[in-house]
Each structure stands twice: as structure tokens, then as C-alpha cells.
UniProtKB/Swiss-Prot annotation:
Enzyme Commission numbers on file: 1.3.8.4
GO cellular component: cytosol; mitochondrial matrix; mitochondrion
Gene (name only): IVD
Name of the featured protein: Isovaleryl-CoA dehydrogenase, mitochondrial
InterPro entries referenced in this protein's UniProt entry, alphabetically: Acyl-CoA_DH_CS, Acyl-CoA_Oxase/DH_mid-dom, Acyl-CoA_Oxase/DH_mid-dom_sf, AcylCo_DH-like_C, AcylCo_DH/oxidase_C, AcylCoA_DH/ox_N, AcylCoA_DH/ox_N_sf, AcylCoA_DH/oxidase_NM_dom_sf
Family: Belongs to the acyl-CoA dehydrogenase family.
Length: 409
């Protein structure tokens, strides 16, 4: 761990100022000084470099043009938290990845969603399933932020029904020809490297799907217009189009027909890391509400003195802390090699639904101001709702949990 104390490292990023917030060391639920310092450092980085752009990103539906957030996060070593040091990563575990996802989400939900798709869905898939040559070719630029990564699984008529995908990969001399479409691809418009799933055998069901590494600029590969979303605005999302797109054989991730294995073996970890996104949104809700209820007065005193307001913030706080405890606990288990599908699904089910409710309470605490776009609470609600839909809906997560419980004896 000594290398992290260099001037350019995360842990060496001085925490010169601390915002007044209940999110102190005593309530962080972290018990290791290195993890605490990591959290504080990422928090300061995100508040200094990402939070000032959050409102503009939401209004313009675009990342800022005057600053490259991808490279800034790369310089801060955030993209490769779980990647080996030999490729420029930090070689840390999923608890650290969750902490980073949480603090970036606290600053901007949309930046964090794009960050999660890049660092978790793309980079971590390559780390776990790529060959040495693939890792050498793709990881350094993805980890530095020079290139952006994405993952494409869903299709216009195949969302939760992954095996029902229609995108087809036909074997030809030296590779495959891809034809079809992918939908709702986060980072799609800007990604240089994409993990894409397609059917190599239409009669083999789940065993006929293969994962491919797609590069921007491949002949026959294009992106449709950027989608105009309710929330997570600025986190670019689009449809991918494949029209006789040739992909060389060396771009297969793992092996032909192993696509569902690649997908499912990483899905539990993807759900876990993405579950930290709602944690950051809930924290941001409290960051907005607590100063407001201290300053806003009605009937001659701060509204925070009223019992019903105190009850609301108590509910918000306990929703955050219980979700945070669950996510951190499961992350520690995963770092120790105990990956449980029902708990990975449970973390994001729990955190996502609570984040939506916490954001609604935040709006209510601000009253009329909560409904005005000048305040951040409306954006936080719109951003929170995505986590009940993306990366498997809440309904699918319940199915996963129920199925796993039924199988246990």
C-alpha cells in the first residue's frame, strides 16, 4: 500500500477542508484507517472536481466541454481500482470500488453512472475474463481515462430476457460478422472499447451467446442518436447498430459460447458496486436537507426544530446507514472470496428503493423549494429512480433472491 502515499495518489490527496455533514468518521461504517482516508480523499476530489459541474451536466445533458472528467478521474487512479498494478490499476478490492462509486455519486449521479459502466462493467470484465494480450491492449488507456469503456447486453426487445437477444454473430474466416442492435448502452456514444454480447449459435440457448470486444471505428459499427433520459442526464446513453460488422477472432472475451458465463460471473459484482450509487444519492439528499432545515424558519423558528421534520431526517438517515452497512458488509465478503448472488442482488434492491424514497422525503422537507429545479432535490430523485431499473430491475432482483433462498436447504 505504500505507493498510495505519493503526491499523485489517492491517499496523498490532502483533505484540507471538510464540509459540515453527519458523514463523519463515526458514521462512516469503515473501521480501517486506510479505507477511511481513501473515502475522505475521494470525497474531496469529487466535491472539488465533479460536484461543481453537476447542475450544468443535468441541464445540458452533457459532460462539461472545458474539463475532461474521464482523464481527471484517471489521474486520480479511480478507473482501475480492481485492476492489477501492472496495467496502471490499484489492485484493490470491491469495498474500495464501492467507496469510490458512493462518493462520486454523492457529487453527481450521472458522472457516477458513467464511471460505474466504465470501471465496473467494462474494465472489471476485461480484468476478470480477458487474455494477457487483451489486457495489455485495452486496459492501460481505459484505466488512464484516455479511452472510455461500455458494456452492451440489452436490446429493444430483450431487456430482462437476456437469452432472447437477436444480435447475431456469424462465424467467418478469421472472425465473426455481427448484425443487430443493442439498446440503452451507457457511455455508448463516447466509448472506444465496448463489451458486447451476441448469439453465435441461435439454437443453443444460453450456451450460444458469446462476448466480444468491440472497438470504436470498426467497419459496420455505429451509434444512433443519444437518448433523452428523465434522469442521469449527461451520462450518455444510446442504441448501438451492427451492420455486417467484422470482429476478429482474437476479440472474443473468454471463449465462444461462454458469453452467459462471462455475464453471470460478473453480474453479482456489478450489482454490488452499482449498489453504492444509491448510497451517494442518499448522502447527497441529507447534504441538501440538513443545512436547509437549520436555516429555513416558519412560525419564528427553524423548521428542523419541528418533530415531524426530525422524524423525516431520522428516516432518511437510518435508510442510508442500514443500506450502507449492507453494501459494505457484502463487499467485504466478496473481497474474501464469498460472493453470494442473493446478497449482491439484495444490496442494490435495498439501496435503490430506499434512495428513491429518501429523495422524495428530501423534496418534502424543502417544501415548495424542493419542487423547484434551482434546488438539487428534483435531480436527485430523477437520478435515484434509474437504479430501480438499470442493471436488472427491482423485480428481477427479487426473483434472484427468492430463487436462491428456495434452493437453499
Amino acid at each position: 500500500m505504500q505507493r498510495f502515499f505519493s503526491a499523485r495518489s489517492i491517499l496523498g490527496y490532502a483533505v484540507k477542508t471538510r464540509r459540515r455533514s453527519f458523514s463523519s468518521r463515526s458514521s462512516s461504517l469503515l473501521f480501517d484507517d486506510t479505507q477511511l482516508q481513501f473515502k475522505e480523499s475521494v470525497s474531496k476530489f469529487a466535491q472539488d472536481n465533479i460536484a461543481p459541474h453537476a447542475e450544468r451536466i443535468d441541464k445540458t445533458n452533457s459532460f462539461p466541454k472545458d474539463v475532461n472528467l474521464w482523464k481527471l478521474m484517471g489521474e486520480f487512479n479511480l478507473h482501475g481500482i480492481t485492476a492489477p498494478e501492472e496495467y496502471g490499476g490499484l489492485g484493490l478490492g470491491y469495498l474500495y470500488h464501492c467507496i469510490a462509486m458512493e462518493e462520486i455519486s454523492r457529487a453527481s449521479g450521472s458522472v457516477a453512472l458513467s464511471y460505474g459502466a466504465h470501471s465496473n462493467l467494462c474494465i472489471n470484465q476485461l480484468v476478470r475474463n480477458g487474455t494477457a494480450a487483451q489486457k495489455e491492449k485495452y486496459l492501460p488507456k481505459l484505466i488512464s481515462g484516455e479511452h472510455v469503456g461500455a458494456l452492451a447486453m440489452s436490446e429493444p426487445n430483450a431487456g430482462s430476457d437476456v437469452v432472447g437477444m437477436k444480435c447475431k454473430a456469424e462465424k467467418v474466416d478469421g472472425g465473426y460478422i455481427l448484425n443487430g442492435n443493442k439498446m440503452w448502452c451507457t457511455n455508448g456514444p463516447s466509448a472506444e472499447t465496448l463489451v458486447v454480447y451476441a448469439k453465435t449459435d441461435t439454437k443453443a440457448g444460453s450456451k450460444g451467446i458469446t462476448a466480444f470486444i468491440i472497438e470504436k471505428g470498426m467497419t459496420g459499427f455505429s451509434t444512433a442518436q443519444k437518448l433523452d433520459k428523465l434522469g442521469m442526464r449527461g451520462s450518455d446513453t444510446c442504441e448501438l447498430v451492427f451492420e455486417n460488422c467484422f470482429v476478429p477472432e482474437e476479440n472474443i472475451l473468454d471463449k465462444e459460447g461462454k458469453g452467459v458465463y462471462v455475464l453471470m460471473s460478473g453480474l453479482d459484482l456489478e450489482r454490488l458496486v452499482l449498489a453504492a450509487g444509491p448510497l451517494g444519492i442518499m448522502q447527497a439528499c441529507l447534504d441538501n436537507v440538513l443545512p436547509y432545515i437549520r436555516q429555513r424558519e416558519q412560525f419564528g423558528r427553524p423548521v428542523g426544530e419541528f418533530q415531524f421534520i426530525q422524524g423525516k431526517v431520522a428516516d432518511m438517515y437510518t435508510a442510508l446507514q442500514s443500506s450502507r452497512s449492507y453494501v459494505y458488509s457484502v463487499a467485504r465478503d466478496c473481497d474474501n472470496g464469498k460472493v453470494d448472488p442473493k446478497d449482491c442482488a439484495g444490496t442494490i434492491l435495498c439501496a435503490a428503493e430506499r434512495a428513491t424514497q429518501v429523495a422524495l422525503q428530501a423534496i418534502q422537507c424543502l417544501g415548495g423549494n424542493g419542487y423547484i429545479n434551482e434546488y438539487a432535490t428534483g435531480r436527485l430523485l430523477r437520478d435515484a429512480k434509474l437504479y430501480e431499473i438499470g442493471a436488472g430491475t427491482s423485480e428481477i432482483r427479487r426473483i434472484v433472491i427468492g430463487r436462491e433462498l428456495f434452493k437453499e436447504e
